[in-house]
Amino acid sequence: MRIALPGLFDLQVNGFGGIDFNAPDLTVARATEALERMRGTGVTRCLPTLITSSFDRYAASARVLARVSHPAFAGIHMEGPYVSPEDGARGAHPRADVVPASVDDFRRRQH
């Protein structure tokens, strides 16, 4: 029996197939490769995720992802840095890189 389903939409993807969307050596080509390989698993749309990290690291990854042009790419999921600084609630996010949410900081991370 064959079953046809719509493609899956993954809302949080840190990387795929050994390609980390937060890695310092991320390139548009590598990000595109990860997205293309994900399609083979049934994921047809996704949000590559940026984790809490230093401003420079975060902004560099955002700049790379912003240049990706692939049908699976639906935008960027920002996992931090706007999370609780409290132990427990903060989870694995590095305390040093957690910042209070502000429109100015949000805009700076996108340029």
How does the language model describe each region?
Residues 1, 9-12, 69, 74:
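N-terminal hydrophobic or amphipathic segments with adjacent small-residue motifs
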Residues 27-35, 99-106:
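Short, acidic/polar
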Residues 24-26, 87-88:
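Short capping/connector residues at structural and topological boundaries
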Residues 23, 50, 95-98:
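Pocket-edge positions in alpha/beta enzyme catalytic cores
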Residues 14-20, 32-61, 72-84, 111:
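Divalent metal-dependent hydrolysis catalytic cores, especially in the metallo-beta-lactamase
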Residues 63-111:
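Metal-coordinating catalytic core of metallo-dependent amide/deamination hydrolases
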Residues 3-25:
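Di-metal (Zn2+ and/or Mg2+/Mn2+) metal-binding site signature of metallo-dependent hydrolases
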